[in-house]
Amino acid sequence: MSTKQKILDEALTLFAEKGYDGTGVDLIAERVGIKGPSLYKHYKGKEEILNALIDVAEERYDEMFGSEKNIGKIPKDREEFIKVTMERISFTMRDPMIRKIRMLLVQEQFRNERISEVTTRHQLDGIQRMFAKIIKGMMDEGIIKNDDPELLAVELTAPAVLQIAKSDRQPQCEEECMEYIEKHMRHFCKVYMKERG
């Protein structure tokens, strides 16, 4: 692993544990095993490290979870919808990098405008728009009953977002949270999906 990557990894762990303001460049360098001034050969400072972390996490999240612009293929039936959605949720709950980024975002969302925007996109607006597109596609295929896809996306995603937040605060509840999310998804499908899959 390159020194530049080690800096990002250690900075992410420290930012998640101590917050952005509670983490100094010298502490990051110490964790990496280099002197503070050596860190500046790789990054201009702490803000550039933070921005690089957000960029890397956004790319990983888009690739593994999806986004409004990358919804993946439209599920063809109830079980595929549940399977794909639960895989996405499992990724977001269990991926160590994404979990640390989320902890950082939650702590820093009130102090940093970019972090505030990223947090809103991943926990509210973006995820709802993504699922509205998926739900609309499933409506167009005759899988989900015609309704307001944006409202259905809120109904689908809000409980999952709350359970993910609970799991972050209480990691011992992770399995319980996953079970609740799946139970909610099955209820959602029972209410809104047509009886064919």
Regions found by a protein language model. Name each.
Residues 5, 9, 103:
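Short alpha-helical elements of helix-turn-helix
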Residues 6, 14-56:
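Helix-turn-helix
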Residues 46, 53, 57-61, 85, ...:
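Hydrophobic/aromatic residues within well-ordered alpha-helical segments
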Residues 52, 66-99, 150-156, 197:
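Hydrophobic alpha-helical connector segments
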Residues 86-94, 102-110, 188-192:
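Helix-loop "lid/cap" segments that line or gate small-molecule binding pockets
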Residues 94, 100, 106, 113-140:
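Amphipathic alpha-helical packing segments from all-alpha helical-bundle domains
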Residues 117, 121, 135-187, 197:
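Hydrophobic/aromatic-rich alpha-helical bundle segments in the mid-to-C-terminal region
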